[in-house]
Each structure stands twice: as C-alpha cells, then as structure tokens.
C-alpha cells in the first residue's frame, strides 16, 4: 500500500513541476502553498491551485474550482482507488508499447519478405540429392522395386582370405566401412544430370583425368600412337581397341582411360554395353572403368573358377592391380583413395605396397557386385556358367 502511495507522490510532484513551468509563461494568481492533508499517517502536500491561461473571449483569469481540488484530495485519501487507477494506467501503457513494437516488427517483416521469398526460391532450385564420385550415378529416393545391396559382418575377413592375408588390414577395414555406409540405390532413368553413358566422359574432363593421361604418355612414350587423330590415347600395343569413344548429342568424346590390360582383354561393343548397364543398375561404391569391366567379364565366363571365392579369380584381380605403376594407381583410384587409405592422421601412407593392396581390395569388391549383377541379367550377359552358392561373401544383393 505504501509503495503505491509513494508512486502517487512522485506523479503529483512531476505534475506540479509542469504546472509551475506553465505558470512562468502566464503570470498566475497567488495561491496557497502550505496546505497539507493527512491520510494513513502520511502527509501530502497539496499542489498550488493551477491558474488557467487567459481565454480569448474573456479578460478574467479562471482558477481551478474548489470541486476539482476536493476530488483530487478525495482520490489521495482513497488508497485502493489510486492503486487501481495506477494499475490500469500501467496496463494501458504496456499494451500500447507492445502493440507499437508489434506493428514495427510487422512493418519490418513486410520489407524483408521479398528477400525471404527469393532465398526460398533459390533453395528450391538446389538439388538435395548428394553427388557421388567419379561420375557415378546420383543417389535416388528409396525405390522398393530396385535391387539393394547389404554388406556382410564377416566382410573384412573374407577380403583377407581372398588376398591370402593373416587378417584384415587397415585398408580392408576402411574399404568395408566405406561400402557399408554407401547407398547403392541407382538414379531413376532420365532424372539425373549425370548420364550412365557419359560416366567416363565426365571423369575424362576432370583435371585429374587429364593429368593421368599425360602421366600415361610419359610412362609409355613408345606405346602411344602419335599419328592417330581419332584415338590419341591408345593403350598398350595389342589393346588399341581399348581406347574407345562414345557419342552424346552428336559429339564424340574419348572415354577416360582405365588400367592397362593384357592381350586377352579388349574393350569391345559387348563389354561397353554391359558396362553401361552395370552403371545404371547401382550407384557404385567405387569408380568402375570399362577396362575393369572387360577384365571381370572374361573371368566371369571361366567354367569352374569364376566364383568370387575362387583363389584363381582373386589372383587374377590381384595380378591386374600389381601390374599397374603406383602413380597410375593413384590416378585410377582418384578420390577413392580416401575410402581405402583413410583420411587425416589415421590415413595409411600411399606407398607402392599399400597402393597395390588398395587397388586389389577395390577390384575384389567390385567383382563380387559385378558377378551378382551379371547372373541376375543373363539375357544381357550371355554364355555364363552356373552361378555358385557362396558361403562367405562381401556383399549380398537382394532383389
């Protein structure tokens, strides 16, 4: 109660100051300034009678009536009434302040609304689908009609056994971790900006691919066909047909060069057709070159040794990796190196031994996926032996 009364005194004193200021401009009549009134043991000084300004229609100066002064004194003596009045005034002031701030915020928002709409439109134009490495197909939304791939729990040990190691190495564990986290769902046909037919074109256009081509020229200067205009990047002698092209929108591109192959492997039209279908079937965990597909296709048609678990198949893939120069392997694996060697402080050094092991691991994983793909598409891939039932496997394709 006293707190309320103190507030009232402050308001009245302020009002008195304003009245005095106005009285200085128009000379006031003398009024008593020693009147006091007592309420609740508190003495209130009654403000001097306020003298009104001279009106235009009269020469008399009118003072505040006694009734007005009496009402003021009654209000001071009634604490509850004064408290309610102050509370209502405070609520009104607070409400007015909130409304004013809200109106200002709405005004500011309307000014920013065109900018916000522009940002929203830009976000809608951004494709939320994550891209993949090496020109592989982009991931698509879940489609139950497509084949999916799962990784077995024993995958690191299976890879170690095929490469005749005593146990999984860091490279093998890195590879399994990468393929476990990978999304194998392919992009819908025609919905992606990355065409499966142009997969290797994109890679060839990348600076690292051009660097690899130049490196190949430096390593095998005598194996290049210098006077060839159509195929300036022929491979080793006996594999001239491996340097192949593809036509997109009437423009012929030279496809990126993969590993050097032996005389038994030639990238022909059948191999290119199967390679393109393989790229469309999955979003591959590692980049796949047509040369690698060609070599795997030959192993796949072995009568008794085509199974991924067969020691002869694993040896052939390992020999392909070991026959490549370390610098060539680095260019072949490109960004896949991080998946195999690791990244940061825990990364394995890119020594010749580690690079060849990494490439061998990659080929083993991709061959198993290619094996299941081909046996699931016998109309596309003919002349295949019976599919073997694998007890141990790296991947499982569910259809």
UniProtKB/Swiss-Prot annotation:
Secreted effector that completely suppresses the host cell death induced by cell death-inducing proteins. This is Secreted RxLR effector protein 36. The gene is RXLR36. It comes from the Eukaryota. Transmembrane segments: none annotated. Residues 1-21 form the signal peptide. Keywords: Glycoprotein, Host nucleus, Secreted, Signal, Virulence. Glycans are attached at residue 75. It comes from Plasmopara viticola (Downy mildew of grapevine).
